[in-house]
Regions:
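Generic structural signal for hydrophobic
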Residues: 1-2, 64-67, 87, 91, ...
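Short, acidic/polar
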Residues: 1, 49-64, 102-111
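Short helix-capping segments at alpha-helix termini
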Residues: 27-35, 93-96
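Divalent metal-dependent hydrolysis catalytic cores, especially in the metallo-beta-lactamase
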Residues: 1-18, 34-45, 67-78, 88, ...
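Functional cores that coordinate and move charged inorganic groups
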Residues: 87, 93, 99, 103-116
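Active-site-adjacent beta->alpha loops and helix N-cap segments on the catalytic face
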Residues: 15-26, 77-90, 128-139
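Short, hinge-like loop/turn segments at secondary-structure boundaries
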Residues: 28-30, 117-122, 138, 161-165
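Active-site neighborhoods of metal-dependent hydrolases
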Residues: 60-79, 126-182
Length: 182
């Protein structure tokens, strides 16, 4: 349905599986029709890693840079500050741009910004965001994507569409999308 709505490029900042990488390869080789796909693949998270050294972080990120052929990763609260710094160093060495997950933790967001993570997905878990946080983000040139579909501390935009639109009767969506997905 993406192409039917004029979407020619997609970016998935984190997937639970590697399926999207296969889909991307199939689009790139012309086996299926679809938008260009950029994805991190599965997140680098606390559930899968407990790095004991920079070398362990480098080895783990090789699956992303060499096998998944991704240019970005999404780091999910992967350990203490030292471990997060190792991920950042390993990513830079392998030319992977890491982004972070907001995690409903402003202190975590701030240390990741200070340490040099170039991106954050999801909003800060506070409102309003004051000039000190805005200034730090601007000074470090960190990309800040509030990800309004999944808002921390506020209403999810996804629910807004289900409440205000009748997706089950959208002809184009139903033509290009399996019923179970709608």
């Amino acid at each position: 349905a993406n192409l039917a709505y004029g979407v020619t490029t997609t970016r998935d900042p984190q997937t639970g599986t590697t399926d999207v990488l296969t889909y991307s390869d199939m689009v790139d080789t012309g086996k299926i029709l679809g938008p260009r796909v950029y994805s991190t693949g599965p997140g680098v998270g606390y559930w899968g890693y407990n790095f004991k050294s920079l070398e362990e972080a480098k080895d783990a990120l090789k699956q992303y840079s060499k096998y998944y052929n991704t240019k970005t990763i999404k780091m999910y609260r992967a350990g203490n500050r030292q471990q997060r710094q190792w991920i950042l160093m390993a990513a830079k060495e392998q030319n992977i741009m890491p982004t972070t997950e907001g995690a409903l933790d402003l202190r975590l967001n701030i240390t990741e910004t200070i340490d040099g993570y170039p991106g954050q997905e999801h909003n800060h878990p506070i409102y309003p965001v004051y000039d000190d946080i805005i200034g730090l983000t601007a000074f470090t040139k960190k990309a800040y994507t509030p990800t309004l579909l999944v808002t921390y501390g506020g209403p999810w935009a996804e629910n807004y569409y289900y409440a205000t639109e009748n997706v089950n009767k959208d002809e184009k969506l139903n033509y290009f999308t399996p019923k179970m997905e709608v």
